[in-house]
């Protein structure tokens, strides 16, 4: 009996099956961001059950991969670390400790599962993972939008203060659709080494504008246009003339990205200090308000939530979806929790 189980596990623990399970896992995450649970109450429970089955498979695959590792080789590599590598290793250790602390203090398992999934994904080639996620996202996007267009999934319409209607087309919030389109453009361009023909760039532009008119997602429009300009400059060889500038931005991004959580917190608190203490007619206050307007009132919104709820070193157990649709709040005015965390959900 035990031998049969081992044989069965060996048959299913293959790279092809592993990527298929990753695709199923990613698909359940996408479904969680749709209005499926609005129409079918048990959908969220079924997706959660499927994810736990995927986690079991993840564990089996990780254990198999760990057994095949040459630990002595890794020990030798660690001995030859330079200062930069030791610094990065230290950051990784701090991050792991923080994730454990977050779990213990808030009982929030999301970061643990995210780390678990990243470890599992590292068992495969990077391009294979990208291709799997791209295919899953592309098929899911077509399926969800089609079902919504046919009336089989709820099209949640969110209205801005000025009356602008924002369609979600099957997703829980309008920005999800525009973000997925943006990511698909990035995925496809990456697969083509960012060498895109003018005709396809024109199709990109039409798609971006069309989605903007449906969702009125301004941030995604601006980011998508910046991506489009960069792809155009890469395709035409213009970026090659500015190698030093490109390298500067690459290094700046790698330095600034890990500092973003701390930096954004400092900026929000500084805005709060200016908002509460500075003269409303002063130049500093006007600059702060202008910056807040550029970020669609996010600085004030986040500072107000900090003031109302407080904050802790290792985070709080909050719902990752801030304004997303549920049966109970479709017609209600929902306040954000700490951050505009529907963007955070995309990262997960």
For the regions a protein language model found, what residue spans apply to each?
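Short, Lys/Arg-rich, polar N-terminal cytosolic tail immediately upstream
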Residues: 1-11
């Amino acid at each position: 009996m035990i031998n049969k189980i081992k044989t069965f596990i060996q048959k299913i623990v293959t790279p092809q099956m592993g990527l298929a399970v990753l695709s199923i896992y990613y698909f359940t995450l996408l479904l969680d961001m749709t209005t499926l649970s609005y129409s079918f109450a048990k959908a969220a429970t079924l997706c959660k059950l499927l994810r736990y089955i995927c986690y079991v498979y993840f564990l089996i695959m990780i254990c198999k991969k760990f057994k095949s590792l040459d630990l002595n080789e890794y020990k030798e590599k660690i001995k030859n670390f330079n200062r930069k590598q030791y610094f990065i290793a230290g950051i990784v250790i701090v991050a792991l400790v923080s994730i454990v602390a977050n779990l213990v203090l808030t009982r929030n398992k999301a970061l643990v599962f995210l780390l678990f999934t990243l470890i599992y994904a590292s068992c495969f080639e990077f391009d294979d993972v990208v291709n799997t996620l791209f295919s899953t996202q592309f098929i899911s996007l077509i399926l969800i939008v089609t079902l919504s267009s046919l009336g089989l999934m709820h099209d949640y319409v969110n209205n801005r203060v000025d009356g602008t209607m924002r369609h979600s087309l099957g997703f829980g919030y309008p920005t999800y659709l525009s973000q997925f389109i943006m990511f698909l453009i990035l995925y496809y361009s990456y697969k083509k080494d960012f060498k895109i023909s003018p005709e396809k760039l024109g199709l990109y532009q039409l798609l971006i504008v069309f989605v903007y008119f449906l969702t009125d997602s301004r941030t995604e429009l601006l980011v998508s246009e910046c991506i489009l300009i960069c792809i155009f400059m890469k395709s035409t060889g213009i970026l090659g003339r500015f190698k030093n500038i490109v390298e500067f931005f690459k290094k700046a991004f790698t330095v600034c990205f890990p500092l973003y959580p701390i930096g954004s917190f400092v900026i929000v608190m500084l805005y709060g200090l200016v908002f509460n203490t500075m003269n409303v007619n002063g130049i500093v206050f006007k600059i702060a308000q202008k910056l807040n307007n550029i970020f669609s009132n996010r600085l004030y919104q986040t500072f107000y939530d900090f003031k109302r709820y407080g904050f802790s070193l290792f985070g709080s157990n909050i719902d990752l979806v801030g304004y997303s649709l549920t049966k109970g709040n479709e017609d209600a005015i929902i306040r954000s929790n700490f951050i505009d965390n529907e963007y955070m959900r995309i990262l997960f």
